[in-house]
């Protein structure tokens, strides 16, 4: 299974990544302009040199500004993390992927663990690779279900709690991130669907941010499935809260709930994703050219 061609040109902003940036930042040190242009043209053997030119000029502008050394560190480290992630994902961009979220604290003997493993196994059989946070709990269950060859792990380096699970620990598809925002960007940019299991603040953060990005047109629309285990009501209770406190209060539209599919059946979850891609091809915003 592969991306439709139009999906290969997307990024997390919803814009065409092949379209050169309209941003033009003239450096305050004009003598460098020609050098930057020549360097960009010489180095850009596979891309429009204007991309590199703007990147270098941004750095020069920062070097001549009141930016702190820490500001530079963030820029450099975030850029390097994006580059490393791109190197890992690039060979697999023709394959659809499902991001799977859920608590790192779910134990092996809990129903949600087996449900996550079963769903990932189903996803693999339907041609999808899986992307997880690379840690324990639901993440490990999903990586076990898909297997190392069909799994990505986007691990976050923390002072406590999270370490890479045994499935992806030695995989060339394990990516370690220092910054949450870069990690989250890659989850959204590289996924064709999202499946969330019961979880805490981190899982809620991923669900709400993905909903926000799709609702506001900052990410390409794709299926969001909230998957419970048989007999459990975690997501039904969550959805009831959303209806009462957000929809009934007029804080969101009833139509926004159409972005979400709640189920307790792994087979139904993957069928929902398959059905979406049998029907969906593309969409446009009014006034977009």
Predicted regions and their residues:
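Short, acidic/small-residue loops that bind anionic groups at enzyme active sites
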Residues: 152-162, 197, 211-238, 254
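Active-site/ligand-binding-proximal alpha/beta "capping" segment
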Residues: 176-227, 275-282
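Short acidic, glycine/serine/threonine-rich loops at helix termini
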Residues: 142-145, 164-166, 206-209, 236-240
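Solvent-exposed alpha-helices and their adjacent loops that cap or buttress functional pockets
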Residues: 90-93, 122, 146, 166-169, ...
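C-terminal functional extensions of proteins
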Residues: 6, 226-289
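Acidic/glycine-enriched connector segments
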Residues: 116, 137-197
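Short glycine-rich anion-binding loops that position phosphate/pyrophosphate groups of nucleotides
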Residues: 103-106, 159, 199-202
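Glycine-rich beta-alpha loop segments
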Residues: 3-156
């Amino acid at each position: 299974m592969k991306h439709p061609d139009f999906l290969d040109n997307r990024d997390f902003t919803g814009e065409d990544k092949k379209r050169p940036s309209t941003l033009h930042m003239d450096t305050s040190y004009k003598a460098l302009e020609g050098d930057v242009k020549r360097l960009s043209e010489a180095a850009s053997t596979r891309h429009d040199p204007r991309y590199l030119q703007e990147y270098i000029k941004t750095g020069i502008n920062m070097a001549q500004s009141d930016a702190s050394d820490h500001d530079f560190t963030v820029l450099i480290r975030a850029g390097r993390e994006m580059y490393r992630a791109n190197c890992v994902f690039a060979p697999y961009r023709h394959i659809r992927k499902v991001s799977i979220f859920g608590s790192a604290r779910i134990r092996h003997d809990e129903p949600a663990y087996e449900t996550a493993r079963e769903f990932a196994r189903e996803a693999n059989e339907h041609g999808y690779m899986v992307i997880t946070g690379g840690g324990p709990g639901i993440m490990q269950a999903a990586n076990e279900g898909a297997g190392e060859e069909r799994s990505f792990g986007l691990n976050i380096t923390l002072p406590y709690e999270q370490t890479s699970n045994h499935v992806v620990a030695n995989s060339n598809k394990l990516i370690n991130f220092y910054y949450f925002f870069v990690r989250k960007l890659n989850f959204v940019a590289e996924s064709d669907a999202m499946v969330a299991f019961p979880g805490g603040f981190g899982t809620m953060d991923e669900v709400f941010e993905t909903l926000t990005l799709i609702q506001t047109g900052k990410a390409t629309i794709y299926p969001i499935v909230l998957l419970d285990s048989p007999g459990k009501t975690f997501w039904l209770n969550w959805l009831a809260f959303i209806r009462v406190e957000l929809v009934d209060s007029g804080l969101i539209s009833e139509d926004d709930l159409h972005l979400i599919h709640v189920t307790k059946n792994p087979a139904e979850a993957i069928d929902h994703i398959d059905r979406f891609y049998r029907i969906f091809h593309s969409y446009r915003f009014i006034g977009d050219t």
